[in-house]
């Protein structure tokens, strides 16, 4: 391992990308970075799924990451979303991030083209060999249509700068298996807010969180409590947030979280780029109810 675990722990926000009339609003990114620093978030992922990376150009993608690093100014670790379903493009993006100031990269399993496990191994090997930046694998089969198997994760863990995985399967049985195959030092970050607390109780180091966009202080406190072994207090916070954990996926992420952030005044409009469309009117009462239960409104 080439990085220490504390850089990748606790409540790491999967940061949304504010837009005004469909264009990236960098001032609002700056505002969000300040919000997360003040709230005690343990890290920021820029340009992940929640950040709408798939609807931005490569130039926009890299600029958002660079500006996020600039705004953070060393006060909070920034992890860059850098994946693609084309290995060559993922390598290109990763190389562009060398020297930018991110602490590592989060690289999603190639989507749509459904590679074999050997193809996935070679994909990640090529990316890792193109950089010295620490790499975190990102497994989210519900979106990609392809599952990175624990056995393949174990193989990939032998590559020095592949240091961890974001598991968004919600399947807690995978955690001990991955730890067995990849080693106890291999970082396990939950990509599923609903099971994030339980994954940390089982030995995971944290959660890359959508809910954190709205409830940053609560998520940070919950993670700190569970990692310190204070499970009852952590569970009390988690129960207030549990409806958000689920309902922020009532429509495709980041549609609900952008609308919720707008309602909370964190961004000026819930603008998205097609093919993503605004939250439907029928879904809005569900999100409002979850925000109320969380004590956010």
Curated annotation (Swiss-Prot):
The keyword Zinc does not apply. It is found in: Cytoplasm. GO terms for cellular component: cytosol. Its EC number is 4.3.3.7. The keyword Lyase applies. Pathway: Amino-acid biosynthesis; L-lysine biosynthesis via DAP pathway; (S)-tetrahydrodipicolinate from L-aspartate: step 3/4. It catalyses: L-aspartate 4-semialdehyde + pyruvate = (2S,4S)-4-hydroxy-2,3,4,5-tetrahydrodipicolinate + H2O + H(+). The active site is at 138 (proton donor/acceptor), 166 (schiff-base intermediate with substrate). GO terms for molecular function: 4-hydroxy-tetrahydrodipicolinate synthase activity. One of its GO terms (biological process) is lysine biosynthetic process via diaminopimelate. It holds the Pfam family DHDPS. Belongs to the DapA family. Homotetramer; dimer of dimers. Catalyzes the condensation of (S)-aspartate-beta-semialdehyde [(S)-ASA] and pyruvate to 4-hydroxy-tetrahydrodipicolinate (HTPA). This is 4-hydroxy-tetrahydrodipicolinate synthase. It comes from Haemophilus ducreyi (strain 35000HP / ATCC 700724). The gene is dapA.
